């Protein structure tokens, strides 16, 4: 039976800009959406311009002081916030930029709305490529992430779902999500990531397994440089099958960070776009309600290819290898294809022996789980999106609902190997 797929896209979200030289480029979302449109994939989905999350929504996970700071700080007044900037880890990796709070509101609102639609059985799969910012902590920003839309989305899912499984295939450990649910068996977190050699964020060892009620409900799969499709598949599929068999989640959240692809500007893995997509296809095959989110990914043209391809898999549509003509067509030079060779010369340091050892350790850990922990019956709170908004300024003062619209920053288009945002790699 065909699945109902909800797709969230805010036309302004790609116009925010972290600043000159910063590797995180929201413009990748505009490129992705352009390909989704020109391939005609939007016809297979219900397309939403998402809800914008309020302070109240964000404070379901984050501290009020931190969210209040995000709403008030701007490039013009940040000199007066020196103490707060340090306290909340806002600075180099997580800079203050124009429209910062609104950017967070847009990507978080989409994840929250996706969770609500899944709760109400209005869709089987919800996609928010702008979300997946898995490093943000309760009291601070981290790793280009300010508000943890994943945690907020999962908290909404937990109103209706006794058990939520979180899977993370970003090259970086999903530390913010793990930390949020470390003490509970209501959420099981499974992260496949590069670990060792001081690679950010430095967490995600195999022996981080959860604590108290959450003991053994946290699973980490630490990987070494250069992992390829075959090696990744050798671990991913059996681990996920075992987790789903044991835990029996009623909903899955999948973070699809594309920095695990070969040729990523900040990555050191060797996955192809097909190999990355195979993970998405495999998780989808279990026919469990699914919230699909973006995440990392710093070679912009390949991020757009990857998430477009994965959108096609989620809607069961075969799309052409030749990219459709769009306003960003020249950006995909020189091959203009969906699946260019993204392999690198990085040696695969994940030997079969190492992978088997990890697999064995993971399976031993799973044996410690209670099968499908149950939840006491409780009243279901009203949907978060029905809450009365008391923290919004008057629309007249704001200048209308869509007051913040910025032109595309030209340096969003730069992402070459030696890119420093001073010279474009592509003629636009």
Swiss-Prot record:
This chain's source organism reads Xenopus laevis (African clawed frog)
Ligand binding (1D-myo-inositol 1,4,5,6-tetrakisphosphate): 17, 21, 25, 265
Q: Principal localization?
A: nucleus
Q: Where in the cell is it found?
A: Nucleus; Chromosome; Cytoplasm, Cytosol
Reactions catalysed: N(6)-acetyl-L-lysyl-[histone] + H2O = L-lysyl-[histone] + acetate; N(6)-acetyl-L-lysyl-[protein] + H2O = L-lysyl-[protein] + acetate; N(6)-(2E)-butenoyl-L-lysyl-[protein] + H2O = (2E)-2-butenoate + L-lysyl-[protein]; N(6)-(2-hydroxyisobutanoyl)-L-lysyl-[protein] + H2O = 2-hydroxy-2-methylpropanoate + L-lysyl-[protein]
The broad enzyme category this protein falls into is: hydrolase
Q: Which GO terms describe its molecular function?
A: chromatin binding; histone deacetylase activity; histone deacetylase activity, hydrolytic mechanism; histone decrotonylase activity; metal ion binding; protein de-2-hydroxyisobutyrylase activity; protein decrotonylase activity; protein lysine deacetylase activity
Hey, which family's this protein in?
Belongs to the histone deacetylase family. HD type 1 subfamily.
What keywords sit in the KW lines?
Biological rhythms, Chromatin regulator, Chromosome, Cytoplasm, Hydrolase, Metal-binding, Nucleus, Repressor, Transcription, Transcription regulation, Zinc
Q: Which Gene3D superfamilies match?
A: Histone deacetylase domain
This entry's Enzyme Commission designation comes to: 3.5.1.98, 3.5.1.-
Bias type Basic and acidic residues, positions = 386-405, 415-428
Q: What is this protein called?
A: Histone deacetylase 3
One of this protein's GO BP terms? epigenetic regulation of gene expression
């Amino acid at each position: 039976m065909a699945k109902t797929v909800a797709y969230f896209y805010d036309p302004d979200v790609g116009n925010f800009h972290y600043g000159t030289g910063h590797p995180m480029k929201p413009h990748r979302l505009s490129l992705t959406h352009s390909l989704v449109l020109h391939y005609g994939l939007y016809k297979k989905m219900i397309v939403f311009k998402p809800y914008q999350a309020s302070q109240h929504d964000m404070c379901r996970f984050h501290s009020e002081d931190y969210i209040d700071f995000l709403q008030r700080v701007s490039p013009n007044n940040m000199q007066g916030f020196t103490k707060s900037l340090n306290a909340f880890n806002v600075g180099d990796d997580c800079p203050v930029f124009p429209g910062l709070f609104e950017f967070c509101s847009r990507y978080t609102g989409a994840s929250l709305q996706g969770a609500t639609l899944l709760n109400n059985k209005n869709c089987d799969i919800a996609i928010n490529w702008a979300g997946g910012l898995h490093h943000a902590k309760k009291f601070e920003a981290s790793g280009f992430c300010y508000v943890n839309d994943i945690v907020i989305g999962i908290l909404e899912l937990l109103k209706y779902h006794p058990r939520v499984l979180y899977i993370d295939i970003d090259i970086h450990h999903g530390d913010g999500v793990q930390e949020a649910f470390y003490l509970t068996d209501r959420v099981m977190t499974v992260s496949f990531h590069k670990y060792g050699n001081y690679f950010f964020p430095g967490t995600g060892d195999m022996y981080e397994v959860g604590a108290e009620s959450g003991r053994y409900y946290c699973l980490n799969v630490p990987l070494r440089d250069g992992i390829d499709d075959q090696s990744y598949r050798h671990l991913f599929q059996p681990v996920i099958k075992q987790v789903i068999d044991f835990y029996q989640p009623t909903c899955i959240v999948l973070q699809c960070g594309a920095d695990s692809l070969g040729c990523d500007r900040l990555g050191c893995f060797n996955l192809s776009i097909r190999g990355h997509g195979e993970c998405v296809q495999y998780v989808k095959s279990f026919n469990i309600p699914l919230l699909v989110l973006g995440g990392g990914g710093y070679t912009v043209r390949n991020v757009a290819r990857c998430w477009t391809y994965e959108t096609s898999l989620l809607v069961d549509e075969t799309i052409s290898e030749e990219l459709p003509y769009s306003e960003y067509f020249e950006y995909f030079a020189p091959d203009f294809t969906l699946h260019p060779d993204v392999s690198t010369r990085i040696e695969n340091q994940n030997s079969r022996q190492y992978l088997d050892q990890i697999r064995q350790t993971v399976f031993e850990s799973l044996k410690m789980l209670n099968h499908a922990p149950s939840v006491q019956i409780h009243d279901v709170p009203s949907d978060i999106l029905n809450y009365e908004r008391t923290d919004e300024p008057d629309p007249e003062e704001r200048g209308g609902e869509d007051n913040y619209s910025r032109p595309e920053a030209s340096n969003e288009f730069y992402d070459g190997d030696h890119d420093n945002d001073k010279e474009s790699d592509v003629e636009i």
